[in-house]
Swiss-Prot record:
Involved in transcription antitermination. Required for transcription of ribosomal RNA (rRNA) genes. Binds specifically to the boxA antiterminator sequence of the ribosomal RNA (rrn) operons. GO terms for cellular component: cytosol. GO terms for molecular function: RNA binding. This is Transcription antitermination protein NusB. The gene is nusB. InterPro entries: NusB-like_sf, NusB_fam, NusB_RsmB_TIM44.
Amino acid sequence: MNRHTARELAFKALFGLDFAPEKTLDTLESLWAEKIAEGKIPPEKLVDFSRELVRGVIEKKERLDEIIRRRAIGWDFKRLAKVDKTLLRLALYEMLYRPDIDIPVSIDEAVELAKVYGEEESPKFINGILGYVAEHIDEFWEES
């Protein structure tokens, strides 16, 4: 198991954030329990990493959504695909609040997850927004 798996489980838990925010951490714990039941015992640091991502996105959701609204030019935020919105929140959280994670890694992970869980255009859409933020990261750090 690696950080990709931890991110994927954080993504799955956060996907329900718009529907039942109070259950998001419970969902994450259930996902980890499934992995353990499959005989895949995760290192505690990966479990902690995914918990921190979920808690961080929940805490900073308003700010992350503001950035998405600003950069999703021509898109109605409410009509954005939930997968795309969730992946953007997760990657933006890493980019803005986890300086220990290289920005290209956060972008690549979001794009790879979009290829699996998103629609055909999701990887391109996500890469475009995150690429812009990466190019102007100093501005976004100042605002955060």
